[in-house]
């Protein structure tokens, strides 16, 4: 949407020079650094971390 400063108002894709529009691993139109916690552990699960190359928060492979 045009209210998002990361979003091209016509295509709603990231503006030139920006990495992302939204997501748990996107802040200020840039991907968060690899290793940034994007989902905290619950119970026996482990934390999930940003990869530095996507705005998504991948699930760790050890999810119980």
UniProtKB/Swiss-Prot annotation:
GO CC list: extracellular region
Tissue specificity field: Expressed by the venom gland.
UniProt xrefs under InterPro entries: Disintegrin_CS, Disintegrin_dom, Disintegrin_dom_sf
Stretches assigned to the Disintegrin domain: 1-64
Compartment list: Secreted
Keyword annotations: Cell adhesion impairing toxin, Disulfide bond, Hemostasis impairing toxin, Platelet aggregation inhibiting toxin, Secreted, Toxin
Disulfide bonds: 6-29, 20-26, 25-50, 38-57
Classification via SUPFAM superfamilies: Blood coagulation inhibitor (disintegrin) (SSF57552)
Molecular function, one GO term: toxin activity
Keyword flag Signal: no
Pfam family, one: Disintegrin
Superkingdom of this protein's organism: Eukaryota
Principal localisation: secreted
Sequence motif Cell attachment site, location on chain: 42-44
Subunit record text: Homodimer; disulfide-linked.
Primary role: Poor inhibitor of platelet aggregation. The disintegrin inhibits the adhesion of cells expressing the RGD-dependent integrin alpha-5/beta-1 (ITGA5/ITGB1) to immobilized fibronectin. Inhibition on alpha-IIb/beta-3 (ITGA2B/ITGB3) is low, and there is no inhibition on alpha-1/beta-1 (ITGA1/ITGB1), alpha-2/beta-1 (ITGA2/ITGB1) and alpha-6/beta-1 (ITGA6/ITGB1).
Record's miscellaneous remark: The disintegrin belongs to the dimeric disintegrin subfamily.
Annotated family: Belongs to the venom metalloproteinase (M12B) family. P-II subfamily. P-IId sub-subfamily.
Name of protein: Disintegrin VA6
């Amino acid at each position: 949407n045009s209210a998002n400063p990361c979003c091209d108002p016509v295509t709603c894709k990231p503006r030139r020079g920006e990495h992302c529009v939204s997501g748990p691993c996107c802040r200020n139109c840039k991907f968060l650094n690899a290793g940034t916690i994007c989902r905290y552990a619950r119970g026996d699960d482990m934390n999930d971390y940003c990869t530095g190359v996507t705005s998504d928060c991948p699930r760790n492979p050890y999810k119980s």
